[in-house]
From Swiss-Prot:
Subunit of the V0 complex of vacuolar(H+)-ATPase (V-ATPase), a multisubunit enzyme composed of a peripheral complex (V1) that hydrolyzes ATP and a membrane integral complex (V0) that translocates protons. V-ATPase is responsible for acidifying and maintaining the pH of intracellular compartments. It comes from the Eukaryota. The chain crosses the membrane at residues 3-23, 36-56. This is V-type proton ATPase subunit e. Belongs to the V-ATPase e1/e2 subunit family.
Length: 67
């Protein structure tokens, strides 16, 4: 289930990037807007995916301290 969620959110991010490419404001700064939006979506996805996967498969297993 964990890997599927990451892929589905990745597809959603790709879809949002494509939509933002065509919906970005037209004018002198069109390419700046397009790249800014696409990079924002990509960086947010990477931050989320790394955090999600780190919690899904932690490097150290939790241990119980006996008193």
């Amino acid at each position: 289930m964990g890997g599927l969620v990451v892929l589905l959110v990745g597809l959603l991010t790709a879809l949002m990037s494509v939509v933002s490419y065509y919906v970005s404001p037209k004018g002198n700064n069109t390419s700046t807007w397009q790249m800014s939006l696409i990079l924002t979506f990509s960086c947010c996805y990477l931050l989320w995916a790394i955090t999600y996967l780190a919690q899904l498969h932690p490097l150290e297993a939790p241990s119980r301290v006996l008193e």
